[in-house]
Amino acid sequence: KESHDCLARKAAGYLDQGRDLVFLTLGDPTVYSTYMYLHRRLTAMGYEAEIVSGVTSFCAAAARLSVSLGDGNTPIHILPGSYPLEEGLSLPGTRVLMKSGKQMGTVKNALVSGAYEVRMAENCGMAGERLVDRAQDIPEDAGYYSLVIVKEKGETGC
Protein backbone atom coordinates (compact mmCIF):
# COMPACT_ATOMS: atom_id res chain seq x y z
CA LYS A 1 0.00 0.00 0.00
CA GLU A 2 2.78 2.44 0.89
CA SER A 3 4.64 1.87 -2.39
CA HIS A 4 1.40 2.32 -4.36
CA ASP A 5 0.69 5.61 -2.54
CA CYS A 6 4.24 6.79 -3.26
CA LEU A 7 3.92 5.92 -6.95
CA ALA A 8 0.57 7.75 -7.16
CA ARG A 9 2.10 10.88 -5.61
CA LYS A 10 5.00 10.80 -8.10
CA ALA A 11 2.62 10.27 -11.03
CA ALA A 12 0.41 13.13 -9.80
CA GLY A 13 3.45 15.39 -9.75
CA TYR A 14 4.11 14.71 -13.43
CA LEU A 15 0.42 15.09 -14.31
CA ASP A 16 0.33 18.44 -12.50
CA GLN A 17 3.12 19.56 -14.85
CA GLY A 18 0.82 18.83 -17.80
CA ARG A 19 2.63 15.67 -18.81
CA ASP A 20 1.04 12.50 -20.14
CA LEU A 21 2.05 9.21 -18.53
CA VAL A 22 2.01 5.61 -19.67
CA PHE A 23 2.20 2.61 -17.33
CA LEU A 24 3.18 -0.45 -19.36
CA THR A 25 2.21 -3.89 -18.14
CA LEU A 26 2.85 -7.45 -19.23
CA GLY A 27 -0.55 -8.85 -20.14
CA ASP A 28 -3.74 -6.91 -19.53
CA PRO A 29 -3.76 -4.13 -16.91
CA THR A 30 -7.11 -5.32 -15.51
CA VAL A 31 -5.95 -8.85 -14.59
CA TYR A 32 -3.76 -9.15 -11.47
CA SER A 33 -1.80 -6.06 -12.46
CA THR A 34 -0.10 -3.54 -10.21
CA TYR A 35 -1.46 -0.84 -12.49
CA MET A 36 -4.96 -1.02 -11.03
CA TYR A 37 -3.67 0.10 -7.62
CA LEU A 38 -2.24 3.21 -9.28
CA HIS A 39 -5.34 3.75 -11.43
CA ARG A 40 -7.69 3.74 -8.43
CA ARG A 41 -5.52 6.19 -6.52
CA LEU A 42 -5.14 8.62 -9.41
CA THR A 43 -8.84 8.64 -10.31
CA ALA A 44 -9.73 9.12 -6.62
CA MET A 45 -7.43 12.17 -6.68
CA GLY A 46 -9.44 13.55 -9.62
CA TYR A 47 -7.06 12.68 -12.46
CA GLU A 48 -8.27 11.21 -15.72
CA ALA A 49 -6.86 7.77 -16.54
CA GLU A 50 -7.51 5.55 -19.53
CA ILE A 51 -7.00 1.80 -19.55
CA VAL A 52 -5.86 0.27 -22.84
CA SER A 53 -6.56 -3.44 -23.04
CA GLY A 54 -3.73 -5.88 -23.62
CA VAL A 55 -3.49 -9.58 -24.35
CA THR A 56 -3.91 -11.55 -21.14
CA SER A 57 -1.11 -13.96 -20.31
CA PHE A 58 -3.50 -16.91 -20.11
CA CYS A 59 -4.88 -16.23 -23.60
CA ALA A 60 -1.37 -15.80 -25.01
CA ALA A 61 -0.24 -19.03 -23.32
CA ALA A 62 -3.29 -20.97 -24.51
CA ALA A 63 -2.58 -19.84 -28.07
CA ARG A 64 1.12 -20.80 -27.82
CA LEU A 65 0.14 -24.19 -26.37
CA SER A 66 -2.70 -24.70 -28.92
CA VAL A 67 -5.15 -25.24 -26.07
CA SER A 68 -8.78 -24.19 -25.86
CA LEU A 69 -9.59 -22.50 -22.58
CA GLY A 70 -13.33 -22.94 -22.91
CA ASP A 71 -15.48 -25.14 -25.12
CA GLY A 72 -19.27 -25.07 -25.09
CA ASN A 73 -20.45 -24.22 -21.59
CA THR A 74 -17.22 -25.21 -19.80
CA PRO A 75 -16.45 -22.70 -17.03
CA ILE A 76 -13.04 -21.02 -16.93
CA HIS A 77 -11.46 -20.15 -13.57
CA ILE A 78 -8.52 -17.74 -13.41
CA LEU A 79 -6.79 -18.22 -10.05
CA PRO A 80 -3.85 -16.32 -8.56
CA GLY A 81 -0.97 -18.26 -7.03
CA SER A 82 -2.20 -17.25 -3.58
CA TYR A 83 -5.55 -19.05 -4.06
CA PRO A 84 -5.89 -22.28 -2.04
CA LEU A 85 -4.66 -24.97 -4.44
CA GLU A 86 -6.91 -27.83 -3.33
CA GLU A 87 -9.99 -25.63 -3.52
CA GLY A 88 -9.00 -24.34 -6.97
CA LEU A 89 -8.41 -27.82 -8.36
CA SER A 90 -11.85 -28.93 -7.13
CA LEU A 91 -13.55 -26.37 -9.39
CA PRO A 92 -15.18 -27.70 -12.58
CA GLY A 93 -13.90 -26.88 -16.05
CA THR A 94 -10.65 -25.17 -16.95
CA ARG A 95 -8.45 -23.83 -14.17
CA VAL A 96 -5.67 -21.35 -14.95
CA LEU A 97 -3.16 -21.07 -12.12
CA MET A 98 -1.33 -17.77 -12.49
CA LYS A 99 1.87 -16.59 -10.83
CA SER A 100 2.39 -19.89 -9.01
CA GLY A 101 6.18 -19.94 -9.39
CA LYS A 102 6.95 -19.79 -5.66
CA GLN A 103 4.87 -22.87 -4.97
CA MET A 104 5.39 -24.73 -8.26
CA GLY A 105 6.73 -27.84 -6.49
CA THR A 106 3.49 -28.14 -4.53
CA VAL A 107 1.43 -27.43 -7.65
CA LYS A 108 3.36 -30.04 -9.63
CA ASN A 109 2.89 -32.72 -6.95
CA ALA A 110 -0.87 -32.09 -6.80
CA LEU A 111 -1.19 -32.23 -10.59
CA VAL A 112 0.95 -35.34 -11.07
CA SER A 113 -1.11 -37.26 -8.53
CA GLY A 114 -4.46 -36.14 -9.98
CA ALA A 115 -6.45 -37.02 -13.08
CA TYR A 116 -5.60 -33.87 -15.01
CA GLU A 117 -4.50 -32.77 -18.46
CA VAL A 118 -1.89 -30.10 -17.81
CA ARG A 119 0.03 -27.52 -19.83
CA MET A 120 2.42 -24.92 -18.48
CA ALA A 121 3.93 -21.78 -19.99
CA GLU A 122 6.78 -19.85 -18.44
CA ASN A 123 7.79 -16.43 -19.78
CA CYS A 124 5.31 -16.81 -22.65
CA GLY A 125 6.39 -14.70 -25.63
CA MET A 126 9.55 -13.52 -23.86
CA ALA A 127 13.17 -14.58 -23.68
CA GLY A 128 13.50 -17.84 -21.79
CA GLU A 129 10.06 -19.10 -22.80
CA ARG A 130 9.37 -22.68 -21.72
CA LEU A 131 6.31 -24.67 -22.75
CA VAL A 132 5.44 -27.92 -20.98
CA ASP A 133 2.93 -30.59 -22.06
CA ARG A 134 2.76 -32.82 -18.96
CA ALA A 135 2.56 -32.26 -15.22
CA GLN A 136 5.58 -34.53 -14.68
CA ASP A 137 7.73 -32.15 -16.77
CA ILE A 138 6.84 -28.96 -14.89
CA PRO A 139 10.07 -27.47 -13.52
CA GLU A 140 9.91 -26.92 -9.77
CA ASP A 141 12.08 -23.82 -10.21
CA ALA A 142 9.57 -22.14 -12.55
CA GLY A 143 9.64 -18.36 -12.36
CA TYR A 144 7.12 -15.67 -11.50
CA TYR A 145 5.72 -15.44 -15.05
CA SER A 146 4.56 -19.05 -15.10
CA LEU A 147 1.01 -20.23 -15.52
CA VAL A 148 -0.55 -23.65 -15.60
CA ILE A 149 -3.67 -24.65 -17.54
CA VAL A 150 -5.50 -27.56 -15.90
CA LYS A 151 -8.38 -29.64 -17.28
CA GLU A 152 -9.85 -33.00 -16.37
CA LYS A 153 -8.34 -35.96 -18.25
CA GLY A 154 -10.22 -36.58 -21.47
CA GLU A 155 -11.68 -33.08 -21.54
CA THR A 156 -11.59 -31.48 -24.98
CA GLY A 157 -8.82 -29.03 -25.78
CA CYS A 158 -5.76 -29.93 -23.73
Tell me what each language-model feature is.
Residues 1-48, 132-139, 146-147, 151-157:
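Class I S-adenosyl-L-methionine
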Residues 16, 21, 89-158:
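A contiguous loop/helix-start segment that scaffolds small-molecule binding in enzyme catalytic cores
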Residues 27-28, 55, 100-101:
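Short beta->alpha junction loops/turns
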Residues 23-25, 51-54, 120-121:
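General beta-strand structural signal in soluble alpha/beta enzymes
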Residues 12, 36-39, 59-62, 105-108, ...:
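Predominant activation on well-ordered alpha-helical scaffold segments within soluble catalytic domains
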Residues 30-91, 139, 153-156:
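Class I SAM-dependent methyltransferase SAM-binding "motif I" and its flanking Rossmann-like core
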Residues 25, 79, 97-99:
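Thr-Gly-centered strand-to-loop micro-motif
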Residues 6-10, 83-87, 106:
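Short acidic active-site motifs
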